[in-house]
Amino acid sequence: MGGSAVQVINASEEHTFVLNEDALSEVLMRDEVKDRFVCVVSVAGAFRKGKSFLLDFFLRYMYSKYVHHDATDWLGGESDPLEGFSWRGGSERDTTGILMWSDIFLHDYPNGDKIAIILLDTQGAFDSQSTVRDCATVFALSTMLSSVQIYNLSQNIQEDDLQHLQLFTEYGRLALADTGKKPFQRLQFLVRDWSFPYEAEYGALGGDKILKRRLEVSDKQHPELQSLRRHISSCFTEVACFLMPHPGLNVATNPKFDGRLQDITPEFKSSLRSLVPMLLAPDNLVYKEISGQRVRARDLIQYFQSYMNIYKGNELPEPKSMLVATAEANHLTAVAAAKELYGQLMEEVCGGTRPYLSTAHLQTEHLRVKDKALFQFAAKRKMGGEEFTEKFRKQLEDDLEEVFTNYQAHNESKNIFKAARTPAVYFACAVIMYILSGIFGLVGLYTFANFCNLVMGVALLTLALWAYIRYSGELSDFGGKLDDFATLLWEKFMRPIYHGCMEKGIHHVATHATEMAVGGGAASYRSQTSVNASNGKVKRS
């Protein structure tokens, strides 16, 4: 065996994946390979479940069949150690990223078709160092790039296995353009260590029996379970299953086990003799197709690059664990309920049928209602812990402030004085200019008088245009600019003058009233003194 495993996609400690383009091109751009159609066989699944171990038996068959052209006894000698993709016993992961076997196996069909067979090994899912995104990315990439995706499972096809498959394949489907066709080709469930041969025999027939049971859709099922099964069927053009026995205690418990057939049970070896040709014999190879078109080896490089660019960017949503997804949905429900309560209470305060409120009063009511909404959010029982909840609480506060901004604008629209400000400003400008024009005309300053007449005309035309926009609903953007300009005139010029005049007027009235009060008091005092004096004279007489 002269080939080796080539790391074509590297996994970094920062939970990112990098394409090794040079290594990929070196394998696929060989003269004898690049123009051939490809069959890509990939094995994916949970870590430490024997994926690389299985692939090395695939390699034995490939070298026997396609290199030495003699597959009579392809399993090899009983004492030959297993070589190929790196594997070992134990509980820690061994493979990271995606590996490709450097030897590409070639086959020419009698009809002239030429095919290149590629084997991929993938990083195991659900180890202690991989995030959900890591697992989803590796599984999705291998599914998108392969024509046969082997889903390696332990002991049974369980509901959580199907849920993970749904998540990972949907993550892959999001990255592909929707062509209206099923996005992936063959999915091969491979159930390892099957312990119930009395229910379903080892091999493809027993696997089909179990697969039919697991993927069956019935009216008695919950809609969520029905949807999951329909999703899997909609993603793959072909779905099959194969049941394999346990390879034996010597394989599982011997730390020095190196893959020798003498340590493996006869049942396992018999299953290998059925499984491997079923997938890799010339008549059973599946051409890699994308959008119904067969893919050549040189084109596969472009697909590697395109798919990696998608997963390196931010175009796809972040896949989440079931706990995080449930907790997020739980919090979003609580946020929606709190926002609904805020909206109901604010409608009672300043809704469409309520009168205008002062800014201070509206702000007070907003704070009161906001506290009620936040209290309801806090009172809801939620998953995820305090830190998770705090993120959504802050988001809720921001959302409520944004909603309050809309209520403020709606409330201001009810202010009849503010609504009348624009026409009042332009009319006042016209009146002032008319008066100034008359004054300038009387003193002979006709240039200034004409200018005032011009400004008066512009103000009246603007007023007429504003009225047309207001009641016709057309040119609303320009109408908003007229309102803004009127507000500017009021705030910068007319309001200061108005306030100055009001202050002077109030000061004058207050001064006059004080003088009147003081003058009236003195007169009253003098009158009272005079009366008292008169009374005294009367008494003395």
Curated annotation (Swiss-Prot):
Transmembrane regions: 425-445, 449-469
Reaction catalyzed: GTP + H2O = GDP + phosphate + H(+)
UniProt GO MF annotations: endoplasmic reticulum-autophagosome adaptor activity; GTP binding; GTP-dependent protein binding; GTPase activity; GTPase-dependent fusogenic activity; guanyl ribonucleotide binding; identical protein binding
Cytoplasmic-side segments: 1-424, 470-541
Distribution of this protein across tissues and organs: Ubiquitously expressed.
Annotated region described as Linker, given as residue ranges: 414-422
GB1/RHD3-type G domain residues: 35-284
Lumenal side: 446-448
Major site of localization recorded for this protein: endoplasmic reticulum
Phenotype when changing R214C: Sensitivity to mechanical shocks
Bilayer topology: Multi-pass membrane protein
Cellular component aspect of the GO annotation: cytoplasm; endomembrane system; endoplasmic reticulum; endoplasmic reticulum membrane; Golgi apparatus; Golgi membrane; membrane
GO annotation, biological process: endoplasmic reticulum membrane fusion; endoplasmic reticulum organization; endoplasmic reticulum tubular network membrane organization; Golgi organization; membrane fusion; microtubule depolymerization; muscle organ development; neuromuscular junction development
Family note: Belongs to the TRAFAC class dynamin-like GTPase superfamily. GB1/RHD3 GTPase family. GB1 subfamily.
Entry domain remark: The GB1/RHD3-type G domain mediates GTP binding and hydrolysis as well as homodimerization.
Subunit structure: Monomeric and homodimeric. The homodimer, transiently formed by two molecules on opposing membranes, is the active form mediating ER membrane fusion. Interacts with spas; interaction may regulate microtubule dynamics.
Protein name as catalogued: Atlastin
Source organism: Drosophila melanogaster (Fruit fly)
Gene name of the encoded protein: atl
